[in-house]
Amino acid sequence: MIRRAHTSDVPLIKQLVDTYAGKILLEKNLVTLYEAVQEFWVAEHRGVVIGCGALHVLWADLGEVRTVAVDPSVTGRGIGHAIVDQLLRVARELQLQRLFVLTFETEFFGRHGFREIEGTPVTTEVFEEMRRSYDIGVAEFLDLSYVKPNILGNSRMLVVL
């Protein structure tokens, strides 16, 4: 079952993220996860959280898929795909037109229609406004130089909804 995350899920989300931190996901502090809990959806099986993913709104027409993680003991069963499908549904409900993801998992996201992109697909005016954000994910989307060490090897992908 895919459902909205609860604050009580945050320690379990942290455990999932920690499994992949420094490999395919950036490390997340508990406070960061609590601050963003309303963006998260979780996969639950028999009362246990086995996967997570978040949808973060970047701009009026643009969102980002973040922090998709599945318990290694249940990978390959479509759980990650179910989470991303839910995030795509929510993005459409919010009337977002495009979703961005920064990922090593290009084949996985490609199955959901994401395509690799170069550059930052926003106007100069929007770029300048987005630069004011304190969110590190926005800086990664904008490809700002101070986040380059965090994103080396990742692919920038976008899907039009």
Which residues fall in each region the model found?
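Helix-loop element at the rim of GNAT/NAT acetyltransferase active sites that forms part
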Residues: R4, L16-K28
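C-terminal "cap" of GNAT-fold acetyltransferases
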Residues: V122-L161
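A conserved beta-strand-loop-helix scaffold within acyl/acetyltransferase catalytic domains
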Residues: E27-R46, I50-V70
